[in-house]
Each structure stands twice: as structure tokens, then as C-alpha cells.
């Protein structure tokens, strides 16, 4: 979990920008979106295989 402490004389916008950058860097939001709905292992393998095929070509 990302934690951002607002510094002295720092605007909320700057703190929010730092928080968003930290969340993006750790991949938290992508992980949440990925786990929003259950995905069967067979579907997960199929997607992984298709992604590898796309990278190759």
C-alpha cells in the first residue's frame, strides 16, 4: 500500500501528484483491475500465451 505524507507548505495537488506517481510505480491500480473479476486458470493461461505470441510478432 502506498503512503504519502503531506509535507510542510506543500499543496494538496502536489501531494496527490506524488501519491498517483507512487501508485503507478508500484502497479497497485493495475493489480486491482486485474483481480476485479475472477479469471479461470485456463483463461489466464490462454491470455498469457496470446500476449507472448503478440510480443514475438
Swiss-Prot record:
Family classification: Belongs to the bacterial ribosomal protein bS21 family.
Gene: rpsU
Keywords, alphabetical: Ribonucleoprotein, Ribosomal protein
UniProt-listed Gene3D superfamilies: Ribosomal protein S8
The keyword Disulfide bond is assigned to this record: no
GO molecular function: structural constituent of ribosome
PROSITE patterns, sorted: RIBOSOMAL_S21
Any GO BP: translation
Protein name from the UniProt record: Small ribosomal subunit protein bS21
Example of a GO cellular component annotation carried by this entry: ribonucleoprotein complex
Domain of life: Bacteria
